[in-house]
Amino acid sequence: MTDHPRVSNSGSNLSTNPPEILLPNEADSLKAQARENSYRDFMMIYFTLMTGLRNTEVIKLTIFCISPYGEISNDVEVPALIAKGSRSRSIPLHPDLKKELHSFLIWKAGEGEPLESDSPLFCSKRTKKPLSPRDFQRIVQLHSTNSINRSVHPHVLRHTFATRLLAKSNLSIVQQMLGHKSIQTTQIYLHPTRDDFTKAIENM
């Protein structure tokens, strides 16, 4: 997913209060900075950008969620136990993310991290236990500050995923991928820009 996401035109009244997102170059800079300093941090950021999971869902994922039978699955399973509202869902994994997850599991083995099915996918380097939501927040804030000169919350990664996905699909698909109970919640991503309006007129 490399298309330019829909962002608001700050000088226009066509869009009001859209979710904060990362532009493609910002997402690339964030990933590059994280990868240079911590493979685990990079994987958490990359995984969230490619799946749109919530902060609390990412940190509670286990190995089983992405590799239930010894190989990387085609989907990440978000079980009811960790999903908001106890609504389980399955999200397809992009081929590039699948390859990176395969490398990540090899890296984890080399680092002596547990790889049992119930082991955390992302864990503390020191304790090998699951990270907290605050830990993930600090990770994203650190790397975003150092790469794009502004501190962003993990939810911005989720917003970025949703906005880019909507540009390639429809609101119903985005609703299902994000795990929203109501499609009204998903409608916050319907913020067309002036360019969107211009293209719509040109395509009439």
For each feature predicted by the language model, list its residue ranges.
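C-terminal catalytic core of Y-nucleophile DNA break-rejoin enzymes
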Residues: 16, 83-102, 118-139
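Basic, Lys/Arg- and aromatic-enriched nucleic-acid-binding interface segment
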Residues: 24-51, 55, 114
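Alpha-helix N-cap/helix-start motif at helix boundaries, enriched for small hydrophobics
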Residues: 44, 56-61, 174
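Conserved tyrosine-mediated DNA breakage-rejoining catalytic core shared by Y-recombinases
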Residues: 60-97
